[in-house]
């Protein structure tokens, strides 16, 4: 019985030692190195005692080695096997040989462990699971085709600032993300081309550091890798599969307590209302929802009514030329009127003002009413675009002054950089020109629009189209869609003249049918949309094929061409831009580019959201192009841009620029669009040229100008 007990105890002790050894070794490279170090020390010490006790020496000298000397000698044998050749006595040689062999084994194992440890470290680095310990960076969560445009815009925005950083977290492989970014974005070349297009001069610029990490944007542990609480702003990108905004909403819920500022695209506006309701009791609302479908629909509809509008929208939204900035007011401007500042700002367009203190009672009744209905969110934040139209009691000596500038106010500027604008104050008297309008009654025109293709934005596009045309206007659709769509359009939008001709595919072989069924010459505008269910390249290819078909059919009749017809094509990949430009189509909407430009700008200045929302939501100020002969009568002379701005200001409107219609198909001249012209520049206009203005298009008194 005692033998069995001793045997059991030995087995138990053996298992304990084995378990302890396995536990420590399983902890990784550091614990293995520690065990090898202990083994080496024990080997050196044990055999040092052997040398001392057996009185062994490497030579014939008398006297035994001290323990310290023996340890040193054995340590040298462990790290340097070549020392054996100096040993003379066989007893010492045998001990040294054993120590050396054990040392070779230990160091061999150590090298193997270190190599494996480094390999594992590199694997972990490749996995992108190491923590980000940076601060004040822009965090991008998710990955979709817009990310390259967003990064490019941020790189340009950061060009004048040191140590700017972008951190990206997505489910993609870290190395693949880095390789793709480096392949698509050459920062040095990007900045060089940007400043060459701006002023042709060389500038000292700084590149932005980009860090990629792999993980799920809805996993708390993965989010902690990038420390979202240290980010200046967070951009959430929705995937093409996330049509219901599910992952976006989950990510917002995970981040809302940590993030300083979140910018995200919301595809379904009902989700925005839901999120607003969930967070209504929170004091700090730090989330900006971009209603991409609404804004893109508005831009598409406007482009179909105003050829060239997409060029204007793109220039306003991206960093390539001028941008919108909020600028603090200098002491010299306090007490001056908005009109004075607007007309005498030489290098910038003053779009509006952000009031430090805004008495809502000073606003016109229509704006107070719209604010009560939850519209014009910008005014809720004291952001006033085109003050000429919004304030009561702003007429002094028969002149609309907009408002008086007070201490703490900020100007909303459209200019080339974020520097302080240049002012040159001087009196400029311009005889007020009577706007040419055929009638005082607002009579909306009847029009015909042809839409080729279908996606979920078609409802909003049609709704926007009918805002400035009569209800008996016709919209014809040629597309493959569900049978319920036409009924849905009529029932929900209330437009009886919306009709769909369901053609499964508009191939070249069907052009005779289309030409016979639809007289293209009878349409004022044509819109080409991509199908949601198709891949990006397939969508663009189908849309471009349709455009070529339209081009061929129009030119066959020799009555008109793409240059003269208002044709808007929606494309998704910016790389297809150059192909579209070859067709001389009047407008193209690059959906992803527009949204990525908006996201990039909002990551730098969140108040721009309220500016863009007013410009592209159809509520408040809008951008329009009017024929120059609506403002001036004498086309034999030149006008400075300041003179033109003064003439336009007399109509309670802000002049943004002009469009030279002779340049409308010239890419190098931005298709004739000239924004933020120096106030001293002289311009000679033709009757068919357009003045680009910012005004309240929704007001009844202004609608006659639009039509």
For each predicted feature, which ranges?
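Cytosolic regulatory regions of ion transport systems
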Residues: 1-707
């Amino acid at each position: 019985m005692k033998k069995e007990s001793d045997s059991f105890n030995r087995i138990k002790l053996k298992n304990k030692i084995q378990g302890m050894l396995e536990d420590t070794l399983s902890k990784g490279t550091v614990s293995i190195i520690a065990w090898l170090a202990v083994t080496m020390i024990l080997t050196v010490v044990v055999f040092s005692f052997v040398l001392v006790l057996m009185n062994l020496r490497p030579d014939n000298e008398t006297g035994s080695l001290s323990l310290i000397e023996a340890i040193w000698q054995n340590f040298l044998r462990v790290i340097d096997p070549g020392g054996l050749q100096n040993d003379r006595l066989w007893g010492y040689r045998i001990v040294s040989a054993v120590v050396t062999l054990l040392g070779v084994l230990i160091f061999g194992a150590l090298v193997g462990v270190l190599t494996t440890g480094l390999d594992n470290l590199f694997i972990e680095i490749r996995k992108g699971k190491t923590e980000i310990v940076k601060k004040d960076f822009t965090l991008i969560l998710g990955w979709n085709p817009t990310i390259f445009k967003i990064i490019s815009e941020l790189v340009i925005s950061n060009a004048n600032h040191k140590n700017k950083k972008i951190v990206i977290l997505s489910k993609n492989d870290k190395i693949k993300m880095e390789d793709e970014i480096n392949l698509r974005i050459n920062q040095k070349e990007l900045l060089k081309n940007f400043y060459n297009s701006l002023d042709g001069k060389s500038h000292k610029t700084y590149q932005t550091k980009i860090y990629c990490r792999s993980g799920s944007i809805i996993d708390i542990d993965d989010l902690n890798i990038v420390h979202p609480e240290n980010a200046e702003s967070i951009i959430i990108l929705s995937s093409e599969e996330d049509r219901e905004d599910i992952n976006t909403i989950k990510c917002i819920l995970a981040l809302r307590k940590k993030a300083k500022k979140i910018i995200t695209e919301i595809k379904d506006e009902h989700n925005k209302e839901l999120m607003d309701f969930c967070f209504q009791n929170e004091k700090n609302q730090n989330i900006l929802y971009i209603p991409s479908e609404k804004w893109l629909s508005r831009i598409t509809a406007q482009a179909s009514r105003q050829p060239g509008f997409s060029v204007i929208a793109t220039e306003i939204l991206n960093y390539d030329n001028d941008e919108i900035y909020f600028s603090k007011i200098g002491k010299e401007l306090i007490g001056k009127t908005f009109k004075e500042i607007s007309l005498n700002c030489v290098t910038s367009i003053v779009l509006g003002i952000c009031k430090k203190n805004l008495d809502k009672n000073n606003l016109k009744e229509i704006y107070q009413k719209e604010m009560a209905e939850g519209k014009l969110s910008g005014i809720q934040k004291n952001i006033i675009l085109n003050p000429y139209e919004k304030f009561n009691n702003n007429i002094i000596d028969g002149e609309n002054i907009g408002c008086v500038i007070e201490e703490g106010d900020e100007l909303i500027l459209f200019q080339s950089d974020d520097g302080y604008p240049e002012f040159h104050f001087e009196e400029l008297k311009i005889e007020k020109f009577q706007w040419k309008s055929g009638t005082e009654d607002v009579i909306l025109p009847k029009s015909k629009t042809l839409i080729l293709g279908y996606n979920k934005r078609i409802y909003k596009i049609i709704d926007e189209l009918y805002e400035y045309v009569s209800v008996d206007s016709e919209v014809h659709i040629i597309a493959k869609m569900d049978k319920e769509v036409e009924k849905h359009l009529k029932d929900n939008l209330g437009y009886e003249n919306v009709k769909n001709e369901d053609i499964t595919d508009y191939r070249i072989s069907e052009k005779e049918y289309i030409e016979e069924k639809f007289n293209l010459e009878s349409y004022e505008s044509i819109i080409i949309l991509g199908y949601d269910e198709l891949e990006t390249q397939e969508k663009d290819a189908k849309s471009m094929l349709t455009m070529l078909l339209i081009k061929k059919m129009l030119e066959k009749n020799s009555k008109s061409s793409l240059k003269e017809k208002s044709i808007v094509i929606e494309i998704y990949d910016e790389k297809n831009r150059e192909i579209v430009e070859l067709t001389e189509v009047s407008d193209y909407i690059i959906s992803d580019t527009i949204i990525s430009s908006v996201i990039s700008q909002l990551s730098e200045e969140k108040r721009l959201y309220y500016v863009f929302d007013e410009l592209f939501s159809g509520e408040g100020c809008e951008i329009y192009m009017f024929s120059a002969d609506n403002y001036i009568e004498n086309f034999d002379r030149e006008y400075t841009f300041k003179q033109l701005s003064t003439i336009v200001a007399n109509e309670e409107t802000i002049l943004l620029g002009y469009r030279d219609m002779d340049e409308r198909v010239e890419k190098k001249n931005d298709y004739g669009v000239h924004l933020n012209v120096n106030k001293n520049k002289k311009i000679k206009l033709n009757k068919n040229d357009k003045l680009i203005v910012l005004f309240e298009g929704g007001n009844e008194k202004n609608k006659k100008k639009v039509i």
